[in-house]
Amino acid sequence: MSAPPPLQIREANAHLAAVHRRAAELERRLLAAERTMRAQAERLACQDQQLRAALDELGRAKDREIFTLQEQLLSSEATVRSLQAAVEQRDQMIQELQPRADLLQDITRQRPPLAALLATLEEAEELGPLPSSHSHGAQLLPDGPGPPLGNSMREEEGQDDQQPAVFGTTV
């Protein structure tokens, strides 16, 4: 075997050096890529952990808010039931008081004529009794009623104590 020519040896050495440099470059790039991937994986794991913690906190906050809203709903429903009971009670009271209200309305409608009648009666009382010459056994008006009767209210008050009259035969 003969030795390769020096040019071939130099070319082969240059080629080996280039392959060696290329391999070293690729190893450096591979190490850099691995470091980058590890750093990204760590960042992603950290972000994932942060997002999971935030998601858990949101879940707890949602559960607290749901609990609060359920309590408010129960309270509101109790208030509604209470108010409905109060409305029913007031409606019943209104139905019970309506006849009295109707009566009071009738009284207020009839009040002006009654007031006028009372004023007229007061005027009549202020006129006083008739002179005594006309009141003894004489009629005030021809073909009219006899002398006015006294106030019968005093007589009726005393009748409660008297025995009632019994009609029929006595034995």
Curated annotation (Swiss-Prot):
It comes from the Eukaryota. It is found in: Cytoplasm. Residues 7-98 form a coiled coil. Residues 126-171 are annotated as: Disordered. Expressed in brain, heart, kidney, liver, lung, skeletal muscle, spleen and testis. Within the kidney expression is pronounced within glomeruli. Keywords: Coiled coil, Cytoplasm. Its main location: cytoplasm. GO terms for cellular component: cytoplasm; type III intermediate filament. Transmembrane segments: none annotated. This is Vimentin-type intermediate filament-associated coiled-coil protein. It comes from Rattus norvegicus. The lineage of its organism: Eukaryota, Metazoa, Chordata, Craniata, Vertebrata. The gene is Vmac.
